[in-house]
């Protein structure tokens, strides 16, 4: 496979990155290094933020294949790092939503559109909503890469975008950030009254907070997968 290396430092120290680059390229790896990035991060945070990004070698992206589709992944794209586990997860999602060839699927908090594009192969239309504009542009590029014409990606807050959409979904897929679904967006999502909702949670406490609203709206918890 392809490997994109990120070297993260502060601007307060100098490093011999040329020697490091040569050492990395000489490593006997199973995959091929297609790019080495130098990310300067002076922020105090539990996530990497780029104050400046430089290409030391090659390119700033790589390609990953999931369930027959190809995705271009850049430095700050949101993408599941464990591709084998991601394939298991996405296969479960696709199997659960079932035959959707004549149906409209909403993928809310769609990131780079991975789930939306996997659903597009078994749906009439998929609409993805994501607040990060860079992720939406990546989703559009990947949809074109996979020759998918029935995907539409919208940049914006789910809370606001749902007010403007004229389409009505038959299936809703939710993959919110760690904080879960915005409390004001939940009633809008539930008002569609779709038969199937898939909630992919990356934080159990957020799921536990949101789940009672679904149960109160008449939904039943049919399947629960944990890892």
Describe the role of every protein-language-model region:
Residues 10-14:
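Helix N-cap motif at beta-to-alpha junctions
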């Amino acid at each position: 496979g392809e490997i994109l290396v990120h070297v993260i430092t502060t601007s307060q120290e100098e490093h011999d990155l040329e020697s490091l680059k040569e050492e990395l390229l000489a490593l006997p790896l199973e995959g091929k290094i297609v790019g080495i990035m130098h990310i300067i991060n002076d922020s105090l945070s539990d996530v990497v933020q780029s104050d400046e990004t430089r290409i030391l070698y090659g390119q700033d992206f790589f390609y990953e294949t999931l369930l027959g589709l190809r995705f271009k992944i850049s430095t700050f794209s949101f993408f599941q790092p464990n591709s084998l586990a991601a394939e298991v997860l996405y296969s479960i999602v696709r199997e659960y939503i079932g035959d959707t060839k004549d149906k409209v699927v909403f993928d809310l908090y769609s990131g780079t559109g991975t789930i939306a594009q996997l659903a597009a192969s078994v749906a009439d239309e998929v609409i993805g909503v994501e607040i990060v504009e860079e992720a939406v542009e990546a989703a559009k590029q990947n949809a074109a890469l996979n020759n998918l014409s029935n995907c539409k990606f919208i940049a914006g807050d789910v809370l606001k975008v749902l007010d403007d959409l004229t389409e009505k979904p038959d299936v809703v897929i939710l993959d919110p950030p760690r904080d879960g679904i915005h409390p004001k967006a939940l009633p809008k999502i539930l008002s569609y009254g779709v038969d199937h909702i898939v909630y992919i949670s990356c934080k159990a406490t957020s799921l536990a907070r949101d789940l009672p609203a679904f149960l109160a709206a008449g939904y039943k918890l049919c399947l629960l997968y944990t890892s």
